[in-house]
Amino acid sequence: MANRVDHEYDYLFKIVLIGDSGVGKSNILSRFTRNEFCLESKSTIGVEFATRTLQVEGKTVKAQIWDTAGQERYRAITSAYYRGAVGALLVYDITKRQTFDNVQRWLRELRDHADSNIVIMMAGNKSDLKHLRAVSEEDGQALAEKEGLSFLETSALEAVNIEKAFQTILTEIYHIISKKALAAQEASSNLPGQGTTINVADASANQRRSCCST
């Protein structure tokens, strides 16, 4: 099968999807990257990822979304994939209280393994199943505020707030990267006789200016 060559992009941002098994992470991934939803989707084994290129404030950003398995037996495998992530979408199922109760455990794991500046959004998924709701939107919002996270309720089935969730994460990441670049430029300009360009992009958010094959 021939490789598809992506269009040129300015930034590559790695984002991880985390949360319990069965909360809808894989369908969030497929809805965002392929605009697809599979009613018969099975639990992810190990890790898979997909990409999508989009515009963020005039820059072309390639989002590399990693879908990490929620099952306990795979947590040791997936922890390695937090490395290099600059964003995370922490997902729970609004119809299953236990998945919401486990959010703080996932947050601890994320903060133990990921960069301290990682951008995190919490998503209460399956908002289309309001008649089965076990977690109120107010409870979700309150926990997000307590932990300093952005928050949305989403539906991969009905494509509600999926786009907004990722756009919010990517825009916030871009703002952080831009501020770092500006600060580095200002620091460099204050050094007389220094003509060296400072590269502030790290391995997880490299500024790219060439085509690449996937």
Curated annotation (Swiss-Prot):
InterPro entries: P-loop_NTPase (IPR027417), Rab_GTPases_membrane_traffic (IPR050209), Small_GTP-bd (IPR005225), Small_GTPase (IPR001806). A lipid is attached at C211, C212 (S-geranylgeranyl cysteine). GO terms for cellular component: plasma membrane. It comes from the Eukaryota. It is a lipid-anchor. A motif (Effector region) lies at residues 41-49. GTP binds at residues 19-26, 67-71, 125-128. Keywords: Cell membrane, GTP-binding, Lipoprotein, Membrane, Nucleotide-binding, Prenylation. One of its GO terms (molecular function) is GTPase activity. Its main location: membrane. It is found in: Cell membrane. Belongs to the small GTPase superfamily. Rab family. NCBIfam families: small_GTP. This is Ras-related protein Rab2BV. The gene is RAB2BV.
